């Protein structure tokens, strides 16, 4: 039996990373680790406690105090200190502030530490902004997913509709996504960049199934070489 490998999937906001990562994990019987949900959880906890997000030390202290856990489900369930926050972390307010929290060095180092612990055994699919560059730099399969800002806004809009969330129009979502891209790619700590050895996959005109098949093909090829 070939031991499972680490699969790193990176890319900008709303590129479809989580959806694809979950399906890839399911296909191979791997664990799925939603790193974005971890940063969203810290953001939600800070907002609920009325912590000023510009106070790096207070937010970092909180990140070290709370326990973030996952449980199987569709969608995968997320808990902060035992309380389910699966829907709450997807709110527009959390989405607007998560880049600020994720840019705090001490928060990132704490999350990276937790993510590496989860990934130690292999057989894991992890998606985020800096998995292939910072969290799992030695992952044998690295994918960098991209799509046009308009297509990502359209997908987010449909996703919001499905969840019954009023997250604004496609145009408003596109502006928010472009702002998020700029924040993510220019931050000082672990900016959003493609790892030198990552495969860039433009999903603008691909179906979810086509994206999953392409990534699965790369995993199978890597497993054969082991």
UniProtKB/Swiss-Prot annotation:
Q: Where in the cell is it found?
A: Cytoplasm
- Residues that, per the record, bind ATP: 11-19
- The organism sits in which domain of life? Bacteria
A single GO molecular function term of this UniProt record: dCMP kinase activity
Q: Reaction(s) catalyzed by this protein? A: CMP + ATP = CDP + ADP; dCMP + ATP = dCDP + ADP
Q: Which CDD domains match?
A: CMPK
Signal peptide as annotated in the record? none
What are the BP-aspect GO terms? nucleobase-containing small molecule interconversion; pyrimidine nucleotide metabolic process
Q: Which InterPro entries match?
A: Cytidylate_kin, Cytidylate_kinase_dom, P-loop_NTPase
What keywords does the record list, in alphabetical order? ATP-binding, Cytoplasm, Kinase, Nucleotide-binding, Transferase
Record-listed E.C. numbers: 2.7.4.25
Any single GO CC term annotated in Swiss-Prot or TrEMBL for this entry: cytosol
Say where the protein is mainly found.
Answer: cytoplasm
Q: Which family does it belong to?
A: Belongs to the cytidylate kinase family. Type 1 subfamily.
This one is known as Cytidylate kinase
Q: Which gene encodes it?
A: cmk
